[in-house]
Amino acid sequence: MTMVYSDNTSIITSAGGLMALLDEQERELQVHALLKIYEFIDQLWPEISDDVTKIEVMYEDHSFPERELAALVVSKVYYYLGEYDEALLFALSSGPKFLHDKNSDYKETLIFKCIDMFIHKSAELYKNPKADPLDERLSGVVEGIFQKCYAKNEWRHVLGIAIEAHRLDIIEYILNADKETDLKPYVLELAMTVVLDIEFRNRLLRLLLSSFLTETEPDYFSVGKCVVHLNDASVAAKLLMKLSSQNDDKSLLTAYQLAFDLEDSAPQEFLNSVMDLLPSPSVANSEEDANADSKKEDSSPCGYIIRILSGEQTVKYDREFLYAHNNTDMLILNRTKDSLEARNSVFHNAVTFANAFMNFGTSSDSFFRDNLSWLSKANNWSKFTATAALGVIHRGYYNQAMNILRPYLPEEDAPSSSTYSEGGAFYAMGLIHANHGRGVTEYLREQLKHTEDEIVQYGLLLGIGLTGMASRDETLYESVKTILFNDNAVAGSAAGISMGLIMLGTASSAAIDEMLQYAHETQHEKIIRGLGIGIALIVYGRQQEADGIIKELNNDLDPTLRYAGMFATALAYCGTSNSKIVRDVLHISVSDVNDDVRRAAVCALGFICFKDPNALISTVELLVDSYNPHVRYGSAIALGIACANSGSNAALDLLSRLVEDATDFVRQGAMIAQAMILTQHNDQLNSKVSGIRKHFEQVINEKHEDALAKLGATLAQGIIDAGGRNVTIALQTATGSLKLSAIVGLTVFLQYWYWFPLTHFMSLSFSPTALIGLDKNLNAPKFSFISNVRPKLFAYPPKSVQPTAKTVQKVETAVLSTTVKAQARAKRAEREKASKGSNDDEMKIDKKTTEEKEATPMEMDEEKSQDISINGNSKKEEPKSETLENFTRVVPAQLPYISFNLNGRYYPVRKFTGGVLMLIDRESDKAPDLIELNRDAVPASADTEPGEQEASPPEDFEYPFDDDD
């Protein structure tokens, strides 16, 4: 029976009569009553809700002609009652009727509810295929919504739902149907930021990878991201070989650019696997070239790619840039050294760290050379950190590492003169080769076998961890574990960290289980803390896979392991801004009974939210006023991590309250955070820079300031001017991936709270900021590009000026009153004699004096007016852009303003996002004009300008340390 809906708009004020009609036996009367109820349901629902079961019975009666209408009425009643699940259930039973309802709020609410249920049920079905199948009515509604989006080309709306619902079939359909060039990178971004399920993410990345590779011109750089996250070295190797074997320059340059991207973002184990899969230069060459010299073999495309993946090429250009543009203000360092008592080990270490950070990668050790007497005051662990500082200063000098450290390394069959220097030298070796230890790890492992001294073992273990970072080398892991089982507190703490570094990001259950078991067995807190940090490193980036161990650590009775649980959470969910994890960490930060755990919890927020610093700022805004100083310290560090290099005024405003805190270590953390935020900033970028720098100096010079605050100020001076003012703290690579070494470096650096030598790990987070353009032969041609912004905005901060010596003014001699009277009488007598002479001379003299006095202010006014006009012209003539050359500093904030000459000889193979950039040569038939690279020879003095640096290397020197007592 076909029913016609009434258009009668008469007002009904009560539902009693209509509800009575529902009890009639006549179907027509029931349908009529139901139509009227539906027509006025928005007003009558309170009365109807009491007898809604009556209408439900009508829906369940299969013989009732308007079952769908009954379901729709029941749905709207439940909607008004706030029972949305029941409302949706009956709405789906009403067929398409609810989609045509005139109440837009009702319709939109239930559509959103449909989508939410579709996502929930689909994701559940993906994880458990045996679960109840998806309701066809629900999928029909959602499919209808999708079809409308398809018709309007609103693909992204559907993609968001499909990714959350784990529907790979829908994603694949859209990727094949749509030809938008930016859709696949969008899905890739969602996969890396939204998807937490590792297994689904990998399947999605596989789908993306195949989709990218089927394109006529694939986005190889997005492909590179996929293979790194999939840890698929074979695909990467095949791709590099395919591109490098093609005859056109663009493909070859793309291969090199992809190799640089992989080197920047992939773990060491992945890079080693790719290099092993690539043909060696000798194999790639033909048989007649087999006897050619190694230099010729290295010039093959595969040879170049292997050198790039090994890190050799990147550090070669980085050290050239850091050497040539070293802008360290040594006067700041010398003033700090003079203000702090050298015999206090805290202050000696602080100056050592500041010097290492300021000269990171520059090879400039002039501060040590010029202050040998100060250096000789180091003792015990101060010797260790001072020797290890050479590793920070000479970071990346792989080929010269042994020569630099030979004076401090043990000689065969010779007694050790200083175990602290030896341990520091091995630590320095690791810092030089951090994350690129393929050639030195075996040497360190052999040394570990032949030493039993805990201090030397400590340096060796840290060095092995640094060189074997993310290598997943089981043999190396077992060697370190042997030292752990000796149960020595000092060496054992380093062993725990080293084991975590070697197995970084593997989530190895075997490694975690045995480390956790030993942590429960040992009585040494140092070892427990080292193992805890090691476990946190193992679950780096694993997200949901790490939930089990995180829960176990967070529920442990030992506060040291709960402390480790916070860092495990931070590293597992680093950069995700996961709201559930943030809530859990915040709860622990205010509820745990241990101050160390609470401090670590707040610090963890910085790692979790560093991709969304504004969210972090709003999260910790209340925590900076906490009654607990450890929470306040953690808030400062979290701000420093999340807002590093951003110059965020909101973060600096919060920190300005903490630098005046009553607790010394809170002030320490606040100053370190300020420095992290303001790296590579000047007064033009942020007006607070000079004031903050001055505050650091005031804290250091203040005689009665607390030692911990002075330590923080000194570290801050080193961080804000790190790498000769040419590096920044970067937790992401140029392509947007997590920067493994930087995140690990900051994590271990924060353990300086317990052990000062770990402060050197901060250097792992430093990234040089330069535009380094290379041609197809990996040479650096001379070419220019434009920075479309005022030069002053991104200029180096001005260097300090040595104050000029003040001239000593003589104090006027006191004169007795009797002497004054005698002198007055003598003057009167002289005037009486002079009055007899001519008055002409007097007039001339007076006139001349008057003229001079009148002329002077006029001249000064003229000079002032000239100065004003000159200054005014200079302001008007300040250029709005500048032309820069290859190997020039380009800070991250400057990147949006960089442009290239479209008609120039060289243009980039892709958009510049920082770091190394491959250049296509439009005039490849002409010989290029190359920049001469000379950094493999000479360490430079920081006080000399790049053009004034001498060609001859400085004489070798050795630290003036006495033998250990």
Curated annotation (Swiss-Prot):
UniProt keyword Nucleotide-binding, yes or no: no
GO biological process terms held by the UniProt record: proteasome-mediated ubiquitin-dependent protein catabolic process; regulation of protein catabolic process
Compositionally biased residues, Acidic residues: 945-965
GO cellular component: cytosol; nucleus; proteasome regulatory particle, base subcomplex; proteasome storage granule
Basic and acidic residues bias (residue ranges): 827-856, 874-883
PC repeat start-end pairs: 385-418, 424-457, 459-493, 494-528, 530-563, 564-599, 600-632, 634-668, 669-699, 712-744
Region annotation Disordered: where it falls in the sequence: 826-883, 934-965
Its job: Acts as a regulatory subunit of the 26S proteasome which is involved in the ATP-dependent degradation of ubiquitinated proteins.
Name of the protein: 26S proteasome regulatory subunit rpn2
Naturally occurring in which organism (per UniProt): Schizosaccharomyces pombe (strain 972 / ATCC 24843) (Fission yeast)
Lineage per the UniProt record: Eukaryota, Fungi, Dikarya, Ascomycota, Taphrinomycotina
Gene designation: rpn2
